[in-house]
């Protein structure tokens, strides 16, 4: 847009100028994270009550439908909302440039929240693949892949035009999240549709179980761990008023997590 081009022209003429960062997408995801956090935790409270007092399982509002609404709202609505907000905030400042595309940022914001709304509605209606943390049916899975690719283009486009040569540790962790979640989602969600809201997994038996918990384990690792570590590496030194103790240790931390964590999914199948 015009303001973005004006900012870039000013930076070319004066390399020391402070870029105008896009804060609207940060605010948007922060607000949506709060909303989904409240929704998810309220539904989670109902699920906990239903476990303790089964008489609170009312009709279609039973535990089997309430629980996946809770997990999807908290993981993909609340936590990922925080991750999106934090990464959009941090990447711009660590690269010292505005995000690659304001339009892609808006599509990411509104597209992702539309996906969470669609997830809540379809799960409430009983439309589910019955795969934990991957319950959503194939039309929503495709939408997730599209919006995630848009986020990836925005991130890598920003990195390509960055004005800071060194990529700080936080960016490494966010990039790992972008790449790994795309791979996990596409492989685990491969399915054969038989109707608009019904599909069967492309895998069978023990292979399906192994792939599902390779995904489930790494959803924890690359949605709830690596991006949060990225936020920690960015905000902790700022709050402490001191630089990170060792950039080399942070890179060792990163590669240790990448090489060890991703292969441990089958332990979820040991009972």
Predicted regions and their residues:
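Hydrophobic cores of alpha-helical transmembrane segments in multi-pass integral membrane proteins
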Residues: 27-55, 60-127, 138-159, 171-196, ...
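Extramembrane terminal tails and long inter-domain/linker segments of multi-pass membrane proteins
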Residues: 1-28, 55-60, 200-208
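Cytoplasmic juxtamembrane interface segments
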Residues: 11-22, 149-167
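Intrinsically disordered, low-complexity sequence elements enriched in Ser/Thr/Gly/Pro
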Residues: 1-3, 104, 163
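Segments that form or flank anion-binding pockets
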Residues: 132-136
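Functional cores that coordinate and move charged inorganic groups
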Residues: 208-211, 241
């Amino acid at each position: 847009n015009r303001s973005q081009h004006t900012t870039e022209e000013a930076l070319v003429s004066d390399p020391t100028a402070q870029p105008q960062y896009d804060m609207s997408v940060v605010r948007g995801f922060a607000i949506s994270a709060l909303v989904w956090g409240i929704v998810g935790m309220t539904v989670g409270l109902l699920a906990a009550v239903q476990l303790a007092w089964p008489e609170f399982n009312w009709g279609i509002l039973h535990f089997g439908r309430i629980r996946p609404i809770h997990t999807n709202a908290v993981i993909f609505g609340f936590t990922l909302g925080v991750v999106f907000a934090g990464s959009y905030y941090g990447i711009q400042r660590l690269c010292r440039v505005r995000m690659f595309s304001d339009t892609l940022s808006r599509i990411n914001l509104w597209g992702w929240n539309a996906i969470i709304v669609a997830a809540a509605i379809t799960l409430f209606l009983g439309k589910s693949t019955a795969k934990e943390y991957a319950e959503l049916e194939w039309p929503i899975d495709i939408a997730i892949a599209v919006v995630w690719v848009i986020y990836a283009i925005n991130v890598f486009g920003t990195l390509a035009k960055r004005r800071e040569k060194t990529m700080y540790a936080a960016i490494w962790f966010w990039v790992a999240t972008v790449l790994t979640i795309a791979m996990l989602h596409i492989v685990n969600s491969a399915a054969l549709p038989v109707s608009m809201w019904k599909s069967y997994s492309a895998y069978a038996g023990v292979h399906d179980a192994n792939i599902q918990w390779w995904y489930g384990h790494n959803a924890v690792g690359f949605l709830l761990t690596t991006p949060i570590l990225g936020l920690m590496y960015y905000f902790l030194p700022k709050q402490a008023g001191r630089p990170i103790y060792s950039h080399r240790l942070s890179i060792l931390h990163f590669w240790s997590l990448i090489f060890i964590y991703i292969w441990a999914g089958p332990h979820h199948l040991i009972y």
